[in-house]
């Protein structure tokens, strides 16, 4: 069947082409609810996700964004073991109740306890009689190890075993806090009726609950985290390891999600993991979204070529302007009762509001977080200013590191035979990710207040766009003035 007669299908819009029309509002910005449910086990308190890029999201970024209420996607440019370890770091960074605490036996060496404590940045380890029966017999903490000279000595010689303070399984955080304070201790092991170790509550975790009240967490009180996989020979092995490490979702990450090979692989992944949350992309059309949902995906990622470091649209001549792509995919998502993530092209907080208004349930951001302390990119000084490296996953360097399969070039062994669809660059250093999130949320709340939307669903239903001319875009930015003091949420690109 020929598509000749519809070759020039329609006009496409991106963020700089449109503005949201202000409307009658009974909503103040501080009253806006930013919660978004992407899947049954994936409810975020803010609609922000950090990209699965090797200069954006490792465990530090994932922890920071989850504490703010969003979600980080651990990139896959590392071994399966390393990526699974990154997921574990996030899941163990914060717990309401630690349901699977580390433990050792009295026969283990002190050095093994120290290694465990340093690797996971914990201050103590429960000690059980045997690995099989898990009967609690003691605990060893930093204080017990402070003056030890022989780290080859068995833990039994240095652990605290008398007057152990414990609590029953099911103890709530309020009761645990009272017990910890009363006995001046930092860790409270939870035991069952047989004295078996069944959990652990720490004062640090209680403090984190208070410090980060909006953190995005799973049913066990652990931070939410996702991780990326490709469509390769190790996909199932990697996905298995990531889920075992605690990942709440995997992101099947390809440049063209509406591809027969990708769809077959996704269907196989769904069959292999029938009850797990699958996010997949990228696509830019309604048909692409439909194909992914039919293959078994829970959440579709939308965006081909809009990213600041992506060259797909000029190298391959392919893509759909992002606002149109979001709107088209969202129409299908509504039909299926599922959700989409708008991935790429966002420069300002106002673009986030536009992406959500067009039908997005959350946005995925790369460049806006690449300059933060938590991003894994290297810091460098250029002309007296501080920058961090930022590169597309389609850049030569990233493809050599492991992302070539994303662009269907996994079989290419020579760097000079790779055809990149991204570039390497630098972005200005921005400080803590939490500061960036604060400004973003302020902008989102303000935009939703202007259009009278109390939550994201109301934004979907009621927001209206106006097409903007080139002169309108110029008028939208500061003009006819020299900026002398940049605002924290606006800079000239």
Swiss-Prot record:
The protein's assembly and partners: Homotetramer.
The entry's keywords: CBS domain, GMP biosynthesis, Metal-binding, NAD, Oxidoreductase, Potassium, Purine biosynthesis, Repeat
Catalyses which reaction(s): IMP + NAD(+) + H2O = XMP + NADH + H(+)
Signal sequence interval, chain numbering: none
EC code: 1.1.1.205
Binding sites annotated in the UniProt record for IMP: 308, 343-345, 366-367, 390-394, 421
Molecular function GO terms recorded: IMP dehydrogenase activity; metal ion binding; nucleotide binding
Activity regulation info: Mycophenolic acid (MPA) is a non-competitive inhibitor that prevents formation of the closed enzyme conformation by binding to the same site as the amobile flap. In contrast, mizoribine monophosphate (MZP) is a competitive inhibitor that induces the closed conformation. MPA is a potent inhibitor of mammalian IMPDHs but a poor inhibitor of the bacterial enzymes. MZP is a more potent inhibitor of bacterial IMPDH.
UniProt: NAD(+) binding residues: 253, 303-305
Function: Catalyzes the conversion of inosine 5'-phosphate (IMP) to xanthosine 5'-phosphate (XMP), the first committed and rate-limiting step in the de novo synthesis of guanine nucleotides, and therefore plays an important role in the regulation of cell growth.
Enzyme class, broadest EC rank: oxidoreductase
Keyword NAD applies: yes
Protein name as it appears in the record: Inosine-5'-monophosphate dehydrogenase
Named cofactor requirement(s): K(+)
Consequence of substituting residue 450 to D: Reduces activity by 75%
Active site: 310 (thioimidate intermediate), 406 (proton acceptor)
UniProt pathway annotation: Purine metabolism; XMP biosynthesis via de novo pathway; XMP from IMP: step 1/1
The keyword NAD is annotated on this UniProt entry: yes
Ranges in coiled-coil conformation: none
GO biological process per UniProt: GMP biosynthetic process; GTP biosynthetic process
List of residues binding K(+): 305, 307, 310, 475-477
Similarity comment: Belongs to the IMPDH/GMPR family.
Domain named CBS: residues: 97-155, 159-219
């Amino acid at each position: 069947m020929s598509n000749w007669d519809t070759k020039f299908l329609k006009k496409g819009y991106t963020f700089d082409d449109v503005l949201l029309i202000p409307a009658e509002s009974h909503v103040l910005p501080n009253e806006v609810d930013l919660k978004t449910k992407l899947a049954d086990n994936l409810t975020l308190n803010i609609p922000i996700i950090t990209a699965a890029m090797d200069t954006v999201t490792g465990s530090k970024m994932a922890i920071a964004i989850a504490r703010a209420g969003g979600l980080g996607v651990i990139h896959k440019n590392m071994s399966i073991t390393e990526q699974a370890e990154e997921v574990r770091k996030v899941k163990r960074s914060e717990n309401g109740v630690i349901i699977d605490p580390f433990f050792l036996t009295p026969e283990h060496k002190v050095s093994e306890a120290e290694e465990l404590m340093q690797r996971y940045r914990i201050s103590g380890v429960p000690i059980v009689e045997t690995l099989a029966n898990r009967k609690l017999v003691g605990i060893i903490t930093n204080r017990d190890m402070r003056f030890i000279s022989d780290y080859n000595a068995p833990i039994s010689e240095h652990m605290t075993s008398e007057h152990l303070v414990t609590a029953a399984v099911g103890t709530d955080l309020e009761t645990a806090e009272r017990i910890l304070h009363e006995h001046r201790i930092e860790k409270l092991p939870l035991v069952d009726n047989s004295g078996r170790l069944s959990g652990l509550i720490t004062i640090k975790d209680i403090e984190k609950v208070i410090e980060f009240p909006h953190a995005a967490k799973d049913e066990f009180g652990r931070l939410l985290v996702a991780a990326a996989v490709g469509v390769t020979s190790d996909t199932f092995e990697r996905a298995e390891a990531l889920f075992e490490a605690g990942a709440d979702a995997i992101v099947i990450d390809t440049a063209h999600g509406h591809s027969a090979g990708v769809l077959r692989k996704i269907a196989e992944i769904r069959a292999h993991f029938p009850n797990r949350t699958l996010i997949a992309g990228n696509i830019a059309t309604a048909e692409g979204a439909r194909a992914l949902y039919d293959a078994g995906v829970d959440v579709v990622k939308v965006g081909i070529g809009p990213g600041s470091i992506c060259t797909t649209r000029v190298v391959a001549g392919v893509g759909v302007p992002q606002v149109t792509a979001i709107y088209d995919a969202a129409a299908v998502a509504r039909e299926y009762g599922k959700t989409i993530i708008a991935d790429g092209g966002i420069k300002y907080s106002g673009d986030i509001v536009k992406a959500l208004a067009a039908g997005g349930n959350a946005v995925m951001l790369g460049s806006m977080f690449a300059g933060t302390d938590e991003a894994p990119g290297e810091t460098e000084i250029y002309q007296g200013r501080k920058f961090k490296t930022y590169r597309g996953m389609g850049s030569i360097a990233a493809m050599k590191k492991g992302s070539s399969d994303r662009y269907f070039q996994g079989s290419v062994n020579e760097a000079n035979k790779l055809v990149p669809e991204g570039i390497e660059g630098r972005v200005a250093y921005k400080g803590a990710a939490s500061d960036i999130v604060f400004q973003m949320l302020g902008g989102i709340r303000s935009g939703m207040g202007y259009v009278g939307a109390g939550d994201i669903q109301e934004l979907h239903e009621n927001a209206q766009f106006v097409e903007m001319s080139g002169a309108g875009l110029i008028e939208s930015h500061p003009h006819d003035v020299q900026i002398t003091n940049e605002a924290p949420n606006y800079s000239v690109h």
